[in-house]
Every structure is written in C-alpha cells, then in structure tokens.
C-alpha cells in the first residue's frame, strides 16, 4: 500500500509530504537525514527549500524546531493556509527565527501558497530540492496547483 502525499515527487526535485504533526515531521526529518547520508557522493549542490504551513490547532513549535535542525536546508518558506484555519504567519516566522541557524538558513514569508511555490522554484537551482510539509491542506493545495498550472510551474 502506498499513501498519497508521502514524499511524492511532483516534478523533478519537488516533493510533497503530508507530515502534519510531530510524529510525521520526525519521520520526514529522519527520511531527509537518511537521504543525505546515503547520497553523500551525489550531494545536491543547489538550495534545499522547505515550504511550511500548518493549521492553528496543531502543536507546531516542536515541528519547527525539528525542521530547523535539518542542516541541509538553506531556505524556509513559510506560507498561509487559506480559509482562517492556518496558523498566524508572523508567529510561524518568529519560531523559525528562534530555532534556525541564522548564518546558514534563510526565512521567507508569503501569504499566498502560489507565491511561496513560485519563489521556491525560482531560487532552488537545477540541482536543488523543494520539500512541502506541515499540513495535509498545504500538500493537497500544492498538488492541485502543480496539476492546474502546469505551464507556470
């Protein structure tokens, strides 16, 4: 059996993972760490971008702390889930700033998911990777955007 939105590669180098709680993020982090260990001779030289959003009723501080421990991540792109269920964008940014390595990691915020995705695609470089995590809503919306806007993305 295969679960949708579990490290699905939507386009070359663009992955969506439905990790939306502490256990899911922990599994996602372990998966990325294992990928890095197994492919050290084929390290990706481009940027590693994580697009993140979460619904407001989740315990998201531990999730953000775990994500910030991923040393291969160069950019965190925080965005807003539409419809009022998403966590506050400023609060999310503040937590990333608290836990990320300010020397090697950057934070970017976009209110619209489409803008976050467009920015991420523009900076990742040919050998870079983008990972979309934090919410099943986010995962589903990005999958839909990639299908609907094939020309743009």
Regions found by a protein language model. Give the residues of each.
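Nucleotide phosphate-binding/pyrophosphate-handling subdomain across enzymes
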Residues: 1-75
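A general structural signal for well-ordered alpha-helical segments in protein cores
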Residues: 4, 25, 89-92, 113, ...
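C-terminal helical cap/extension that packs against the catalytic core
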Residues: 14-15, 63-129
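Short amphipathic alpha-helical segments
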Residues: 27-29, 63-65, 89-91, 143-146
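Residue-level signal for short, function-critical loop segments
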Residues: 54-56, 80-82, 136
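Glycine/aspartate-rich loop-and-adjacent alpha/beta segment that forms the canonical ThDP
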Residues: 136-153
């Amino acid at each position: 059996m295969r679960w949708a939105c579990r490290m699905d590669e939507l386009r070359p180098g663009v992955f969506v993972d439905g990790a939306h709680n502490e256990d899911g993020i922990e599994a996602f982090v372990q998966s990325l760490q294992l990928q890095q260990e197994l492919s050290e001779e084929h390290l990706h030289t481009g940027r590693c971008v994580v697009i993140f959003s979460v619904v407001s009723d989740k315990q998201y501080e531990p999730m953000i702390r775990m994500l910030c421990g991923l040393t291969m991540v160069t950019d965190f792109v925080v965005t807003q889930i539409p419809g009022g269920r998403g966590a506050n964008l400023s609060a999310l940014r503040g937590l990333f700033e608290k836990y990320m390595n300010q020397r090697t990691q950057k934070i970017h915020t976009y209110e619209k998911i489409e803008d976050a995705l467009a920015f991420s695609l523009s900076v990742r470089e040919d050998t870079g990777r983008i990972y979309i995590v934090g919410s099943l809503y986010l995962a589903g919306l990005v999958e839909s955007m990639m299908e609907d806007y094939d020309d743009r993305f």
